[in-house]
């Protein structure tokens, strides 16, 4: 449940060349800021078991919305009520410690999501198999490719069986075969009445996976409803923009 949620950020007007220069300017009161509004009065009610796609151009507020639901970002105004365990896949590799091994990161992420160390160790082989990284589990995350990190993040987050799963473009780096595996796992989520949000620039993916879609533009909800209808409106808007810019 989100009621009138607004998120504002303060961003410096000028780019400084170093942390030292920034600190000096700040102490001297010479840093001026602009206010960036990422979300503007967003209200949503999502029932358990809903599969919600979130679409919109870059900078529309999609990732900020996910961060608010994940309690990573606190709203400047409004109310947020989230019931149940949330597993966020907000950015590729977010939350992973680069110097720790894949195994250590799985245990760490699992405990942060409410599982015990023993439970995560017991599930380790299954997680590594799903992520297709069995031979690399004890290597540092910094040695992983982007795709390997994304697969491990998805496998870990979905294995802990959260009530709410947030996916922000985390599948965009996977090959079609792995994406199909992810779809199958998300279908299992649906059958068990779990809720998930899918942020994607692939409108066809949203249409195939979700039964509700939200279109964000400049931090506001432009449309909320049937995925095919919402995506059709968004496509038409995007085409008009291309015609104007061309």
Where are these regions (language model features)?
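Conserved ABC ATPase "signature" C-loop
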Residues: 218-219, 234
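H-loop/switch region of ABC-family ATPase nucleotide-binding domains
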Residues: 200-201
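Conserved ABC ATPase "signature" region
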Residues: 20-28, 107, 119-136, 155
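Conserved catalytic segment of ABC-fold P-loop ATPases
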Residues: 208-215
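The feature captures the beta-strand-to-loop junction immediately N-terminal to the Walker
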Residues: 55-57
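Pre-NBD coupling/linker segments of ABC/ABC-like ATPases
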Residues: 1-40, 227-246
């Amino acid at each position: 449940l989100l009621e009138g949620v607004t998120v504002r950020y303060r961003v410096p007007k000028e780019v400084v060349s170093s942390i030292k220069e920034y600190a000096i300017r700040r102490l001297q009161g010479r840093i001026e800021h602009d206010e960036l509004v990422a979300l503007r009065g967003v209200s949503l009610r999502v029932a358990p078991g809903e599969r919600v796609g979130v679409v919109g151009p870059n900078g529309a507020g999609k990732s900020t919305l996910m961060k608010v639901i994940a309690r990573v970002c606190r709203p400047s105004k409004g109310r947020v009520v989230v019931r149940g365990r949330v597993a966020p896949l907000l950015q590729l590799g977010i939350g992973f410690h680069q110097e720790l091994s894949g195994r250590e990161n799985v245990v760490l992420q699992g405990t942060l999501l409410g599982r015990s160390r023993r439970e995560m160790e017991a599930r380790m082989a299954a997680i590594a198999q799903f992520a297709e990284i069995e031979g690399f589990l004890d290597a540092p995350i910094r040695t992983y490719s982007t795709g390997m990190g994304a697969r491990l993040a998805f496998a870990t987050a979905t294995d802990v069986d959260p009530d709410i799963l947030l996916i922000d473009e985390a599948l965009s780096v996977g090959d079609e075969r792995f994406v199909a595996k992810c779809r199958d796992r998300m279908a299992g989520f649906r059958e068990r009445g779990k809720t998930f949000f899918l942020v994607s620039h692939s409108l066809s993916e949203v249409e195939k996976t979700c039964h509700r879609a939200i279109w964000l533009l400049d931090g506001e909800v432009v449309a909320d409803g049937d995925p095919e209808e919402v995506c059709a409106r968004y496509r038409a808007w995007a085409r008009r923009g291309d015609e104007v810019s061309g």
